[in-house]
């Protein structure tokens, strides 16, 4: 378990923020961030979550000196036909890098790829159907809408 937690914390900074642009003019997006699920890809014992975002004032991401989190994932298991949120010992909270370092209010949109590693499921569970709900907060603590990954099944190692 110690090794798993160590690998999770080492993986936290591995966040790809690509395709960030400011093609839209200021005021075309609300100041609250808006996210949209794009894809969820499982590769071995880890996974990648892809989503897009817009933010009207560009205060997305945290400076290296900030100590909090701005990306939050809730983990759910399908238990006896009902979705149940499971609080894991090491939560899947992440830090997105600052996209607008100028400090000027400016609309941004982009795509984010989050590496969820090494274990994207609950190793202590007998349930095999999972999904994630995720959201972000900007520097002003505006919370985005919540998005959900599709349901997926895992196969326990034999």
Outline where the language-model segments fall.
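Hydrophobic alpha-helical targeting segments used for export or membrane insertion
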Residues: 10-17
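Bacterial signal peptide processing site
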Residues: 24-26
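C-terminal motif of bacterial Sec signal peptides marking the signal peptidase cleavage site
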Residues: 19-22
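First exposed extracellular module after export/assembly in secreted or surface-exposed proteins
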Residues: 32-158
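Bacterial N-terminal signal peptides that target proteins for export
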Residues: 2-10
């Amino acid at each position: 378990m110690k090794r798993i937690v160590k690998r999770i914390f080492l993986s936290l900074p591995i966040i790809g923020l690509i395709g960030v642009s400011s093609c839209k003019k200021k005021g075309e997006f609300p100041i609250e961030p808006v996210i949209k699920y794009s894809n969820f890809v499982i590769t071995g014992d880890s996974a990648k979550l892809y989503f897009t975002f817009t933010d009207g004032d560009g205060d997305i991401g945290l400076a290296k000196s900030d100590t909090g989190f701005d990306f939050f994932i809730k983990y759910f298991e399908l238990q006896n036909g009902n979705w149940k949120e499971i609080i894991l010992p090491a939560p899947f909270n992440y830090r997105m890098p600052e996209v607008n370092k100028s400090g000027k209010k400016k609309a941004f949109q982009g795509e984010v790829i989050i590496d969820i590693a090494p274990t994207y499921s609950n190793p202590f569970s007998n349930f095999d159907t999972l999904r994630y709900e995720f959201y972000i907060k900007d520097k002003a603590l505006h919370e985005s809408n919540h998005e959900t990954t599709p349901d997926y099944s895992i196969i326990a190692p034999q």
